[in-house]
Regions:
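Charged, heptad-repeat coiled-coil alpha-helices that serve as long linker/dimerization "arms"
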Residues: 1-95
Length: 95
């Protein structure tokens, strides 16, 4: 193997390591975003269970609308996490 070929192989290996590291970080971030979303949904569920909210139709309607927004956002976060996990798994298979 020539020096040029060896240098190319080293660069290729370094890029692969950097890509793997970036994918692992993306998975960690996506997982944290899901956890944060779950906490937000749980906190909003507690708010909706208070007498102040459920006894007031306007507040209850606004809370229900916000709850649905939080649930939709959580679903998007789960999809992002799943996509990140799949990308990492594919990269690990091709290693």
């Amino acid at each position: 193997m020539t020096r040029t070929e060896a240098g190319k192989e080293k660069r290729k290996a370094r890029l692969a390591r950097e890509q793997m590291k970036a994918l692992k970080e993306a998975v960690k971030l996506a997982e944290k975003m899901v956890m944060d979303g779950e906490e937000a949904v749980a906190a909003h569920e507690e708010l909706m269970a208070t007498a102040e909210v459920y006894s007031n139709p306007d507040k209850a309607a606004a809370a229900a609308k916000e709850y649905q927004r939080l649930k939709d956002e959580l679903a998007r976060r789960y999809a992002n996490w799943e996509a990140a996990e799949e990308a990492l798994a594919e990269a690990e298979e091709n290693e």
